[in-house]
């Protein structure tokens, strides 16, 4: 079983009746073999299901409409084994509301130089059949991924999976529900936004709830459930014995167990896969959830602090896109700088950083929370795993959305941080803090982000194209002046592309 379970990609091959039944039978057989080969690949994370050969406008429309109505089909891979006149594809592609990838390949890798004849040439026409098909996609102004190369090549299979993972993220976005407990942090701008526009653009829903609703869910948690939860904490984390012997510390840990179980029950009942809260809206709760939120993120929930529903949604989407990967994804904030050689960013938050970003065993501690509220709260302490990562910010530009991505290199802190009672990661932005921070600020990037080592820029770009959203990248080659030009050009393009 592939990691995405019943969710699958349909493999559809284009041809026409010009070639006769013998050729079409061979086309169908080869198509089955390619779909099976991709499914069998260790590099492809979902089942690729062959849906046969389409040879007429009606067959094409039928398969596109069938894909639209199949909830387990998250996208299509389209390939022209022979020549397939592209006017036949207009109705189907116009009706298709799921993403598709154009695989420009052919069944055999090498030409049989001594045996090649016109029968071979007529059967293996993707070199020009895919160009005909590509024209109509461009003519229809459709965003799609184009992968070129032999289907058995590892690099091709990896590109296919990049798109598959983006399609899984897009499918998740279409059904995602975000629960907001309380509202945004007062007077904060970037966490605001148009939720109706977001639902139109991304598909996900955002629903607000009073703290009383969540408090009721937490009140239903029994002492037995809390005791069982504490046993899980003992298994999963390092916890000093005095946390359990000190009455106050034990109470703080029990508070987190109650909050975790209460929030999870609430989210499960409403089919919510992401949530936000705010330290300014805690009436009826024992405190700001720390360990509770960290554990929910580690289970796959998206999270955004201070009511940041855009980051919560993207956090969940990226977690789905990176399913099965060892590297993690978390809500994050650029917290403070180390100006040195090189300049570095210490990322953290009040409490809520996901332990999936660390290879070390987290430690549970009870420490004083001094921002917004003053209360002892149990939380996990750990340091992010060194290696390449991406910080992702989704912002509302007023008339549209923008995704900003900054490549960073996470490093081991040069010294221990014994007095810092929160989880953290230390990174060096590419190309430098000076350039990256300036570009981020010019682009309007938030102080919150989704920090991930689980996806790459190609996957994120594929997702942005599926969503029809601008994406700008801050990386090794970024120049601030050129980046500002890109922002200006994009502003014109996206304004005109949506019509006057």
From Swiss-Prot:
**A biological-process GO annotation:** L-arabinose catabolic process to xylulose 5-phosphate
CC per GO annotation: cytosol
Keyword vocabulary terms for this entry:
Arabinose catabolism, Carbohydrate metabolism, Isomerase, Manganese, Metal-binding
One annotated GO molecular function is: manganese ion binding
| Chain sites annotated for binding Mn(2+) | 306, 333, 349, 448
Instruction: State the family named in the UniProt similarity comment for this chain.
Output: Belongs to the arabinose isomerase family.
Which NCBIfam families does this UniProt record tie to the protein? PRK02929.1 (NF002795)
Protein name listed in UniProt: L-arabinose isomerase
Q: Which organism is it from?
A: Saccharophagus degradans (strain 2-40 / ATCC 43961 / DSM 17024)
